[in-house]
């Protein structure tokens, strides 16, 4: 007999614990159990048992994504004079982090210190991760330093904190000194390098991982996703490695989840292999918005903008809601097809219907849409109508359009604005020099190159560490 409603029952604490564990991932059932516990006064029966129920309720709401309810339960727990234990705090810390409630996380730190749980390794490790995720690397490292004999989980939390905050030199140095590593350790370092754009290093670490002599480390899905991201954004050697990973996934009959499938799709899309990208897309069983975004972007960026727009219509027919990344892909597709009116119409309707707040990157895409069609004056007027000062992404789009249509006068004006915003960006100086050369203004072209040298800027040559 399947139980679907508990509203007509009273529950003992033992029954409540059993049912909460049984329905851990069912939000409606958890709420019903919680309601019965409140209305039957069961939560005042036994302090020890009540503590277990509170902990389980907090963890249950956390599991179903109701972070604020988890945090509110802690307040109710204290008001009911039920003392938390070391198992209470890790779930609460995760809830504070997931709900971006930095102030609540700091308050939990104070509560843990006050109640003597700050020396529990499980609690300490949770705070290492919390401070790392909210951008306070100093507090994260201080908390880690207080852990006596940190286990591999604590070490991985420190690696993650460093990676999230761009401190990959320290992370890699510490990683190399770790006495014990696991797949999470290796994946965290690979992901950290990949997120920072250090793709050569990410691929190097992956190579060391699969050839590791200290222990056999088998890559997992998260490892492949991180490595594939670097493969997609590196050179042809990276693409070859990505194809080898794809072959490994197929040979091991690994299920193509949305995350793994999207990573493969994105790699093939950036490599220009649209047929394989479409094949991967068809193989993904549960097509979430990220998969749709990847295939639309791949088509839009590789000469099939109309097919990208058709894919967008299929996405809506599948009841998948577009997001900000979808909008960028759609605007790119319209720009490549020079469908200015359709692009502006979709920009307005998507933002309105799906409550998407456009960023400067979106506005930059609109400028690119208008400018690519040769409507440079309209693009400049659009920029002037924006409710904020245009940044480099917006002005850069107009500069790109000026290059396409060789409008040296407007290009020079926009280029000088960009140098004011990004005085250390070599591309702006090179662009201005090129515009002046096109206009046969050789003295100005030379002046721009000298200005770049005087600013201590040089073009970075491309390189590859893969053969």
Swiss-Prot record:
Question: Short name of one Pfam family for this protein?
Answer: PPR_2
Start-end of the PPR repeats?
A: 50-84, 85-119, 120-150, 151-181, 182-216, 220-256, 257-287, 288-322, 323-358, 359-389
Domain of life, source organism: Eukaryota
**Which residue stretches, if any, does this entry annotate as coiled coil?**
none
Query: What Gene Ontology biological process does one annotation of this record name?
Result: RNA modification
Q: Which GO terms describe its molecular function?
A: RNA binding
Sorted alphabetically, the keyword list is: Repeat
Q: Which InterPro entries match?
A: E_motif, Pentatricopeptide_rpt, PPR_At4g14850-like_plant, TPR-like_helical_dom_sf
The annotated region (Type E motif) lies at 394-467
Q: Which PROSITE patterns match?
A: PPR
Question: Gene3D superfamilies in the record, alphabetically?
Answer: Tetratricopeptide repeat domain (1.25.40.10)
Which family does the entry's similarity section mention? Belongs to the PPR family. PCMP-E subfamily.
What is the designated name of this protein?
Putative pentatricopeptide repeat-containing protein At1g10330
**Which species does this protein come from?**
Arabidopsis thaliana
> Gene symbol?
PCMP-E71
